[in-house]
Amino acid sequence: MAVKNKVVIVTGASSGIGRATAKLLGESGAKVVLAARNEDKLQQAVAEIKEKGGEAAYKVTDVSKREEVKALVDFAISEYGKIDVIFNNAGLMPNAPLSELKNSEWDEMIDVNLKGVLNGIEAVLPHFIKQKSGHVISTSSVAGLNTYLGAGVYCATKHGVKALMEVLRKESANEKMNVRTTTLYLGAFRTELATRITNKAIKERIEFLYDTIGADPMIVAEAVKFAIDLPEEVSMNEITLYSTAQL
């Protein structure tokens, strides 16, 4: 299932890993539909892809809203006639100790990190089942494999993504959907995740981590491309990437 001519939706595409992945896939011949909430950054990202000769379009989308994600998939199909891959990458990480009771931040993480992935699956699955082909890629985190102080809700959402994707893989095989799945468990990469952290001590620690040992988001983009490029009868079910310097 080579990347060239595949129609790929990338959420969280205005910056970081999503933007790097959209750029690489676009330059590799995919038809990329970028989605995020920041229209200015989406326009810039699409322009960069087109300058390199790639095909790309964008749609402002809040992945926490089911109807907007369904509209995103409909838009991709109207633009390019089909949908082959969705990369559920949008995420937030406003970490703080549970004792701070930042319930609005809890709700937002659950809505974007977990329900956003579920909304993406819901929107594409009928199309994938009908065409007997498709690929769901979702960003979890090493916080989906471990637990960390000050990251209780974030860890819970990323463990949830892990569970969703594992069940989707098994149900795809059991129901003969022929839908491939890939879950990314990512360590420290240079992204904007720390910008939403309101706890000063945690924000400073994460920013220092990213600044000192954070890896290039393009490395994740290369891994995503590799997973898509594999033959259709094979799923790269899990990819774990740490910065080499990360404990």
Regions found by a protein language model. Give the residues of each.
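Conserved glycine-rich cofactor-binding loop
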Residues: 14-15
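Conserved glycine-rich Rossmann-like NAD(P)H-binding loop of the short-chain dehydrogenase/reductase
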Residues: 30-44
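The beta1-alpha1 cofactor-binding region of Rossmann-like NAD(H)/NADP(H)-dependent oxidoreductases
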Residues: 39-40, 60-72, 103
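Substrate-binding pocket helix/loop in short-chain dehydrogenase/reductase
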Residues: 97-98, 105-110
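Active-site helix of classical SDR
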Residues: 121, 157
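Residue(s) in the substrate-gating loop at a strand-loop-helix junction
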Residues: 141
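C-terminal helical subdomain
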Residues: 179, 183-184, 203-247
